[in-house]
Amino acid sequence: MQTSHYAAEKDMQDAAPRLTFTLRDEERLMMKIGVFVPIGNNGWLISTHAPQYMPTFELNKAIVQKAEHYHFDFALSMIKLRGFGGKTEFWDHNLESFTLMAGLAAVTSRIQIYATAATLTLPPAIVARMAATIDSISGGRFGVNLVTGWQKPEYEQMGIWPGDDYFSRRYDYLTEYVQVLRDLWGTGKSDFKGDFFTMNDCRVSPQPSVPMKVICAGQSDAGMAFSAQYADFNFCFGKGVNTPTAFAPTAARMKQAAEQTGRDVGSYVLFMVIADETDDAARTKWEHYKAGADEEALSWLTEQSQKDTRSGTDTNVRQMADPTSASAFNH
């Protein structure tokens, strides 16, 4: 589950005496409910009519502590290194994922915590050590979301974009990356040799106290195959308005891919929740947000999504740019 903005936190506080949401044990085994925290400005609504706010630690702490209070299972932060611009400067202002989640790990006690690694920016040995550190802070409640990187300007601005051939090789890169992580988390040592990484008696200690959970967001065939082999969970996107099962074909593809590897890989589905006292009030709020859609920022996202011409039509970013997805608007 994905919160849309800080107003959702206020809605949760206002509604607190009336919330009686529980899951039976057998339901909890089948379903996990989490919050995708607003690490970037304005959360998840690309609209001039939505609340405009900056990301802060205090904001994210309040949301994650409230989620933990109501027995949510996990909190996850993305990573974004350059935003979409527009009138709202959407995601032009962002916190950093690992340091944010380390702080949140220290002020929570039960909820699972996930940070996102932009793998082009961080060597796997550094991610392995940071993850082990947050595992220690959290008491074994930490996991890592691995992203290959799709938004070229994020990396060009730092001089580290490897060239457009990377679009077709990014899961080869990520495969080597996760193999190094597995070595270091599992044995504390890696001598991995590959096309992208060369480890020479690389050491990480202490190791995580529990097996490290890995999330990916593969939507392409290559992404699904990677998740089937290496991930514990794979993200997919909810679509439409009040169509909660529209993601089912994507989840079915993931299940089929996992059957080929003999692994159990769950699907995490991203939904944007627009909440109010009644369905009609929520619909009115949604229409108000939609009327203020930041077309400039949305156009920039669509333009960037078309830069990758080598990974197929079902990539993660193209799902994001789909106007029926959880992070955009139905035009």
Curated annotation (Swiss-Prot):
Its EC number is 1.14.99.46. One of its GO terms (molecular function) is alkanesulfonate monooxygenase activity. Coiled coil: none annotated. Residues 312-331 have a biased composition (Polar residues). It comes from the Bacteria. The keyword Flavoprotein applies. Keywords: Flavoprotein, FMN, Monooxygenase, NADP, Oxidoreductase. Residues 300-331 are annotated as: Disordered. It catalyses: uracil + FMNH2 + NADH + O2 = (Z)-3-ureidoacrylate + FMN + NAD(+) + H2O + H(+); thymine + FMNH2 + NADH + O2 = (Z)-2-methylureidoacrylate + FMN + NAD(+) + H2O + H(+). Induction: Up-regulated by the nitrogen regulatory protein C (NtrC also called GlnG) and repressed by RutR. FMN binds at I79, K80, N145, E154, R170, Y171, S220. GO terms for biological process: alkanesulfonate catabolic process; nitrogen utilization; uracil catabolic process. It is an enzyme of class 1 (oxidoreductase). Belongs to the NtaA/SnaA/DszA monooxygenase family. RutA subfamily. HAMAP family: RutA. NCBIfam families: RutA. The FMN-N(5)-oxide reacts spontaneously with NADH to produce FMN. Requires the flavin reductase RutF to regenerate FMN in vivo. This is Pyrimidine monooxygenase RutA. It comes from Escherichia coli O7:K1 (strain IAI39 / ExPEC). The lineage of its organism: Bacteria, Pseudomonadati, Pseudomonadota, Gammaproteobacteria, Enterobacterales.
